[in-house]
Amino acid sequence: MAFDFGNANDQQKEAIQTTEGPLLIIAGPGTGKTFTLVKRIVYLITERGIQPEEIMVATFTEKAAKELITRTTNELYKMGVQVNLNEMYVGTFHSICLRVIKEHLEYTRVKKNYRMLDQFDQKYMIFQHINDFRALPHYEDIFTKKIGTWKQAGEIAKYVSNLLEELVDVNGMLRDSNPATVGMANVLALYQKITEEENLIDFSSIQTEAYSLMLNHPGILAEIREKIKYVMVDEYQDTNYIQELIVFLIAGESENICVVGDDDQGLYRFRGATIRNILEFPDHFIDGKCKRVDLTINYRSEKEIIDFYNDWMTSTDEKFVWKNFRFPKKIVPGKKDYSSDTRVVKCSGKNGVEDWYDSVYDFVISLKHQGVIKDYNQVAFLCKSVKNDKVINLIQYLEAMNIPVYSPRSEMFFTRPEVKEILGCLIMCFPNYFLRLKTESFTYSYPDLYRYYREECVEAAQKLIKAHKDLKKWYENILRNHSQLKSNTDYAFTGILYQLLEFEPFRGYVGIDIGSGVTDERAARNISILSAVLGKYEYLHRVEVFSEKNIISAPEIFFNMYMRFLFEGGITEYEDDSEYAPSGCISFMTIHQSKGMEFPVVMVDSLSAVPRTQSDGVIEEIEKKYFHRPAFEAKEDIKFFDFWRLYYTAFSRAQNLLVLSCYEKNGIGRTPSKYFESCYSTLPSYNDVDLSKMELEMVKPVNIKKSFSFTSHIELYENCSLQYKFFKELGFTQIRVGATLFGTLVHETIEDVHRAAMRHEESTITPDNVRAWLDTNYLTLSKSEHSYLGVKQVDAAYRQVIAYVERMSNGTGLTGDGAVTGESLWSHIQDAEVDVSLVKPEYILKGTVDLIRGDGNTVEIVDFKSEKRPDLTERSEDFERYKRQLEVYAHLVE
């Protein structure tokens, strides 16, 4: 039966069918890139006979990976092809590299129970060690200008991430004659020492660790190459040096590499990405071997919009020349019935910023009243930053005029009423801190923060306490306890938060129905985020309860230090991957954030911007000597290249109407700047164009399947649907009530035993080695969980593992009640810690099987439990739960 190409055009068909050897797909905006990728994966599986697990697909974001998985599995499901997603290497570079590390953990510097650092965690870890960094030789040569401690931590995080991804020679840098270079080498060396000692891993070191693992262990690399026969990379224009190395290392001599991207949409230089990867991709192969396919037929935008952004890329007004730093291309409309009406306009304010606010409002509301806009989510407002006062004031203006706005990255978290109310109530629960806050009697002065606490948070809380008698009674009781605390409480910050949720208005906030809409759910989502902030602080500072020792210090550190960093840096509000443009709201987002999206109406702001050189003398000096590739573009051209690419990306998000918007201004801060003058000045104002008959497309729903597992979802829902809503749907942080160390320790050590058996190293499964594995696991586990076992408990865990080892070694089976065969059962182990999944039309069911074993055609599924064995004759509730779990796993394995 012939392959179903769907609506693929000739360009797309060529890309889909070119499966062998290197392939470069240049995919312009709206040209069906994801459609082509999905069809290519399906073609490989169904037409070329490639197993799904032989394909690796690296995406730029987790959301893109989820969408790709959903669309691919839907296609395969319709064709009757079953896929175990966990066998496929699909995800971001970071998630794929992390999987490689996990599968071969014993060969890396990373140990079990490592802690992943996000961007804030990384900065905070550096901040906690800042005195160690400052004591390094030549540290002062890096930071010649005085900046605050938190900013220094941020700069160090940026530097080490960049240098790690470029694989610089630290030892060579230490011998350099430039003091700043030596200082940077010392910083990098200390950073690596700390992360190794504390068993930490960040986003950059995930990639370098995976690369080092494959490079230094030929056997592991050969195993990975045996698995992965085809490599595909999305958004290749935004990859960096280490990612390119990983791609070519995995692909090996087969060179079955397909990279997809658009050199005109390369936006992430500030994160270490380089456009050279996509432009120089064909140069890695002998002449003529790399095939290039250009996707240039745009199915997204109206013709006038396409012409507008085509002209933007080619009309550089003699300010610069692209030379060889882009692939020449012309995007053409794919819509057969495109409109001949005006589809690019401007929306201006001529008499100050307030006049501009009025113009934006009038533009939106007139289209709504005319019935052109059916849903506010058809409009998106794009700008360089959603954090500046001008944009935030516009958001607040529109909301005051009853136009809801969705802008989770505008850092408005601390302006939300529910956040102020919760923080105010928390502050008032600590009488010593509250008293000192009134007079700012602290060692360090942070007047803006203290003013926010007093005038906004505490005032909001006092109004609530006055209005709600039950809340007032609770507050008076906790205040009395904290004023004369004699014994430990059974709660910390998170516990107080959850006590508050018993009272109005907080109970009403979290009692909202899921699916009510982003604005209705916002309060519940923000309180959930606050629970994560509190939980993270409690973990990092080991605050499990309040006591006489910490009732004074813990609140001060939390409010004046930890929260200060978040207050100054901002907290992103909740974003739903499955709904990038929530119904009923105008979306405000950065141009970077909008990448890969499309909207019927796009308003582009930030027209006062000009190309700016971003330079860092210290890094530039290191780049010249220690990066493995010389600089690619000329330094003086980079600012123009990046500027033009940024706004090309913005303009090309529009489907039906593109609007350039600003308040016009002359003199300093001229708006629009001269770089937009030629394209802006010729545009008609929206007032001068009849838009009433324009037909807008509706926002396309994002098709992302949700994943569910037995223990994390099904079992939790069966036990308590309210807990499921709270912890899984709203994402609240669970209070740490002491880790189940014993069971985890036994489980992890048995996993070590299984790994040795699967490597055919049964001779290493000795009592001494088992004890060594258990001791190592206990060390990392106790450090990770901040919890400890007594010597007798550790010994008991060891005895459980040894008992299992003896049963497997002498053939009595897993439970010890089988016949003694005298033959080892290690060879019966087929796999351990197996991730399995089952794809359904509406969801994905996942699970992790502890052990799959069998002899001949038999297969046994084993799930280890460290608690007391249930009475099998009485069929207890525990027994029934275990039975259901194994039935689900059996279903997945089948």
Located regions from the model:
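P-loop NTPase Walker
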Residues: 1-110, 116, 219-222, 252, ...
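Conserved RecA-like helicase ATPase core segment
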Residues: 2-7, 42-46, 128, 241-347, ...
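Helicase P-loop NTPase motor core
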Residues: 31-34, 52, 287-291, 297-403, ...
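Conserved P-loop NTPase-based nucleic-acid remodeling module centered on helicase motor cores
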Residues: 54-151, 276-280, 725-726, 732, ...
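Accessory C-terminal helicase-associated subdomains
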Residues: 181, 200, 372, 470-593, ...
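ATPase/helicase motor core of nucleic-acid motors
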Residues: 284-287, 342, 365, 369-504, ...
